[in-house]
Regions:
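Anion-binding alpha/beta catalytic cores of soluble intermediary-metabolism enzymes, centered on
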Residues: 1-217
Length: 217
């Protein structure tokens, strides 16, 4: 079983509630349709309801098993704002909650904060910086984590390591010029992530961007 088959099997065994705040993009809507058809998660699409239904029709996605969260539905916005206000440690005032709840990414992340969904998926249309800032604003860092980082899993033809052709690399996308403490945090978080996702027993090598000025820039 290859990596993606493993991940799909885990998802099917324990489907999570996933919010998609960019489903007004046809590519993302197609992803939502495929995930729903395969039973890999419960999909919540967040945005302008009329637009989302139009895109779904355009790409042939059946919305009967997908929850549409219409950020322009005034009654539902008010009901959601009241639920958010009632949650412990709500970080915003009433007016700000109602304003933010009308924005698809903000609404989706707010839903995650109060456990109406488990996960958010995005970044196709929004920038990495926007998604990270939104996550920090509404969700925050996991306990024990003090540095934001990313992890990529690479399938390298010809490589035969402890996990076959697969290697995890962190962090190649988010934290620029980390100090020693940040490097340590990234290494620990990367190891924990590959163990949680793939069940690997991680072995960590610390690789330098540049050796004695060989890669200036």
């Amino acid at each position: 079983m290859d990596l993606m088959e493993q991940v799909r099997a885990k998802a099917a065994a324990n489907p999570q509630k996933v919010a998609f705040f960019e489903a007004d993009d046809p590519k993302m809507m197609e992803v939502v349709g495929e995930l729903t058809k395969d039973g890999l998660c419960e999909c919540y699409i967040v945005g302008d309801g009329e637009t989302l239904r139009g895109v779904a029709e355009q790409v042939g996605v059946d919305l009967s098993k997908i929850t549409v969260v219409d950020v322009n539905d005034a009654d539902e916005n008010e009901a959601f704002a009241q639920r958010f206000e009632a949650a412990p440690d709500s970080p915003f005032k009433a007016k700000a909650i109602r304003r933010r709840a009308k924005k698809p990414m903000d609404r989706a992340l707010m839903m995650q904060r109060i456990d109406e969904v488990d996960i958010n998926f995005g970044g196709l249309c929004c920038s990495t910086g926007e998604v990270i800032l939104g996550g920090l604003t509404y969700i925050g860092l996991a306990d024990g984590v003090d540095t934001i980082s990313s992890l990529g899993v690479f399938n390298i033809p010809g490589w035969d390591g402890s996990e076959g052709p697969l290697l995890g690399f962190g962090d190649a996308a988010v934290c620029v010029d980390p100090d020693p403490e940040q490097l340590a945090s990234i290494a620990i978080t990367s190891a924990e992530t590959v163990h949680a996702l793939m069940g690997w027993e991680p072995r960590v090598a610390m690789l330098s961007y540049s050796t004695d000025g060989s890669a200036e820039g």
